[in-house]
């Protein structure tokens, strides 16, 4: 199996749904082999890493994938707080980052296009 989005869940509006990573996880648990692509795996960052003289900022709402991937590549990160971890608001930022063993450079409440 090829899993192009390792996230376990995704928020679509006000609804939280299982994501491709959940299917891949179950497939592995029953003995299947999964090749993962996407954050936090390095292949997705190759193009950004090859840009000389530029700074990279990884933006995402998932500490396990978006921010962990940035940390693994030594890129700066921006966590969007109204995403996957919004229900963990009882944590201070520092405790939340410690819980997931990540380092976050910047936080922002919401991201709109």
Predicted regions and their residues:
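Asp-based, Mg2+/Mn2+-dependent phosphohydrolase catalytic module
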Residues: 1-113
């Amino acid at each position: 199996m090829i899993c192009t989005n390792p996230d376990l869940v995704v928020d679509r509006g006000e609804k939280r749904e299982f994501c491709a990573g959940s299917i891949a996880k179950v497939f592995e648990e029953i003995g299947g082999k999964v090749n993962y692509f996407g954050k936090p795996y390095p292949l997705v960052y190759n193009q950004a890493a090859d840009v000389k003289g530029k700074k990279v900022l990884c933006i995402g709402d998932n500490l396990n994938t978006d921010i962990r991937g940035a940390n693994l590549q030594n890129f700066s990160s921006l966590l969007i707080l109204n995403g996957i971890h919004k229900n963990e608001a009882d944590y201070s930022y520092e405790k939340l980052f410690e819980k997931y063993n990540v380092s976050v450079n910047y936080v922002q409440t919401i991201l709109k296009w």
